[in-house]
Curated annotation (Swiss-Prot):
Cellular component GO terms, alphabetical: cytosol
Database matches in Pfam families: Hfq
Name of the featured protein: RNA-binding protein Hfq
Membrane listed as a keyword: no
Taxonomic lineage: Bacteria, Pseudomonadati, Pseudomonadota, Alphaproteobacteria, Hyphomicrobiales
Keyword RNA-binding in record: yes
GO molecular function: RNA binding
Alphabetical list of InterPro entries matching this protein: Hfq, LSM_dom_sf, Sm
Organism: Afipia carboxidovorans (strain ATCC 49405 / DSM 1227 / KCTC 32145 / OM5)
PANTHER family per record: RNA-BINDING PROTEIN HFQ (PTHR34772:SF1)
Length: 82
């Protein structure tokens, strides 16, 4: 079934930036700005790497994630799935 293979937007986004090693700027709910590349993630946290150091960031602390370059998550370059 197609529904079994479907991923949510968050997992699709994080998996894409992880595989492409896209640099990210992450803003936390307390205003702190983090930058780096996602090397791993699960339901509760992600591992952010920069300058040879890794940070474990809890997702509940994240406000906004901005990729450093334009990304296209879906075929055809559209922002909505078919």
């Amino acid at each position: 079934m197609a529904a079994d293979r479907a991923q949510n937007l968050q997992d699709t986004f994080l998996n894409h930036v992880r595989k492409s090693k896209t640099p990210l700027t992450i803003f936390l709910v307390n205003g702190v700005k983090l930058q780096g590349i996602v090397t791993w993630f699960d339901n509760f946290c992600l591992l952010l790497r920069r300058d040879g150091h890794s940070q474990l960031v809890y997702k509940h602390a994240i406000s906004t994630i901005m990729p450093g370059a334009p990304i296209s998550l879906f075929e055809g370059g559209e922002d909505t799935p078919a």
